[in-house]
């Protein structure tokens, strides 16, 4: 067991040298091909809770199928991200993978895109103005309230300009008119 651990630690040093980067879509299965075998390939996931985990003996948190050479990742999720290392005990050959999980791309059919573009062009080229029957009552009420508010503000400004000047005895001949 000590020789296996020493082999794994020595191999960790060379992980970045010969790694293959694999992008797997979320929810799919993927097979990692191991090195040529003389006995059996042992698969480990580097960087887990224990520095390395022998994953063919486990069922959680990742589900895999191991045969003598290959490792199949089942129903891939985000926890499958990481370095996978397969080595043959007898021949000291190894394969390592950097697994990255990607989100599936949502594709819109081209016919839908064309229909959406045509609809947008129709709306853009022929703007419709609502006739008097289609104008909602709330819109009329809002417009009336805004007009009334503006009128009140103007009246208040005129009253202030006229009466404030009279009370301060600074009458301006242009503002001096009787209401």
Swiss-Prot record:
List the coiled-coil residues.
none
Keywords linked to the UniProt accession? Early protein, Glycoprotein
Return the Pfam families for the record.
Answer: Adeno_E3_CR1 (PF02440), Adeno_E3_CR2 (PF02439)
Key word Metal-binding present in the record?
no
Question: Which residues are tagged as glycosylated in the record?
Answer: 29, 57, 70, 75, 123
List the InterPro entries: Adeno_E3_CR1, Adeno_E3_CR2
- Keyword Oxidoreductase listed? The answer is no
Q: Where is the signal peptide?
A: none
Q: What top-level branch of life does the organism fall under?
A: Viruses
Q: What does this protein do?
A: E3 proteins seem to be dispensable for virus growth in tissue culture cells. They are potentially important for virus growth under special conditions; E3 region may help adenoviruses to evade the immune surveillance of the host.
**What family does the database annotate?**
Belongs to the adenoviridae E3_20 family.
Name-wise, this protein is Early E3 20.1 kDa glycoprotein
Organism equals Human adenovirus B serotype 3
